Structures are given as structure tokens and as C-alpha cells.
Amino acid sequence: MEDRVNEAIEERKSGNTVESIRILKELIDEYPESGSLHYQCAWSHDASGLEEEAVEYYEKALTYGLDEEESIGAYTGLGSTYRALGKYEKSKEVLEDGLKRHRDRGLSVFYSMTLYNLGETKKAMELLLGQLCDTSSDESIQSYAAAINYYSRDLDRTW
């Protein structure tokens, strides 16, 4: 099975998502409760621009169980897919659930985008600015990190 999964991943990486999906669906027929196969199939659907179809596979992947790395990817993928489909509340719900389970910066950034779409711009900016301060090695950002973090908590405040 591992060789076939690797083949499907390589097909996806080379842009042949149709073949990747075909291989993964065959494997899912053999191993219908494999969270990892459902996750890979969801990813290949997403890479094909088939977001609606990806949702079912992401949901099954999370239901059947994944290792930590794949779980983070599935929460990110599903939350991002819901956002791309305009299902912002569902996106928020999925990403919040993912963030309860995993401390992951990528999840947090996608969550910020969803908050923006929901009009929760203050919270979105606070999260993004915090990520910027925490991850940037740029000296000019780091020299102002304390101020950026302080101001990010209430961007509308004036003195």
C-alpha cells in the first residue's frame, strides 16, 4: 500500500491530480477507514480545484484518525476549503477545533483569514501581528515587537 500512496503523492506533486485521485480512491475502496488515505485524497481534490469534493474526504480523515502532522494538515485544509467556499462559520468552527488540538502557526493564519471574512478584523489583525512578531527575524520588526504586540490588542485606540 505504501508504494501506491507514494505514487499518488508523486502524481499530485507533478500536477497529475486526476491520476492521484484515481489511485487514492482505489486504495480507499480497499481500506475504507484509513484516515491517512482520506486525507491524501482530500488534498489531491483540493489541488485539482475540487474543493466541494475535498470536504467529504477531509471530514472522514478526521473521523478515522490521523497522526499529528496529518491532523494539522486536515484541519488546515478543511478550514481553508470551507473558507474558499464561502462557508465562513463552518471554517471558523473547524479551525478553532484544530487550534484546540494543535498549537500551529499555519492554522492560526488561516483562522485569521476566516475571522477577516466574518468581519472580525480586530481579532484577525491581532493574531496576524502576533504571528509576525513571533516568527520574523527582521531586525526592524523585532526592534518594535513589544510595541506591535501592544498596539495590536486595540488598533482603534488613540492617545
Locate predicted features.
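TPR/TPR-like (Sel1-like) alpha-helical repeat modules
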Residues: A61-T63, R103, Y116-E139, N149
